[in-house]
């Protein structure tokens, strides 16, 4: 599955980067966040030790993190030069990569998600919350 998702994404990004309607992928990302940054929920107030853990690509979410002042991002990765997907951060990969980067004994105080597929991360957290729209429900 990872191979298929990676190849599909690579093909899409390669075509997008060659499009005459797009100045650059980076500009497309900037334009996207100029338009949608305001949709980040107001309840989220970044802290210095926050980690954004997502299956989305560093290419896109990295810009949101920069604007939010969040320095810690664990995301799927794309080599911008080749548009090849180098890492997919989903399912059990999230917990594995998180532990690789932050250590096996790091404590997660609070974990927020919109997906039950994040159960491995929920299990690692002291407190966990499911987010749906503007509703936040504690699940652990």
Where are these regions (language model features)?
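A metal-dependent, Asp-based hydrolase signature
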Residues: 1-40
């Amino acid at each position: 599955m990872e191979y298929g998702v990676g190849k599909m994404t690579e093909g899409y990004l390669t075509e997008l980067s060659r499009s005459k309607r797009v100045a650059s992928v980076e500009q497309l990302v900037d334009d996207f966040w100029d338009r949608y940054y305001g949709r980040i929920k107001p309840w989220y107030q970044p802290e210095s030790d926050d980690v954004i853990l997502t299956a989305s690509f560093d290419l896109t979410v990295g810009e949101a993190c920069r604007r939010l002042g969040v320095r810690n991002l664990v995301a799927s990765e794309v080599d911008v030069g080749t548009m090849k997907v180098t890492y997919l951060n989903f399912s059990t990969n999230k917990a594995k990569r998180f532990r690789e980067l932050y250590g096996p004994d790091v404590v997660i105080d609070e974990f927020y998600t919109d997906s039950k597929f994040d159960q491995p991360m929920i299990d690692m957290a002291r407190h966990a919350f499911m987010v749906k729209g503007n509703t936040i429900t504690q699940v652990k």
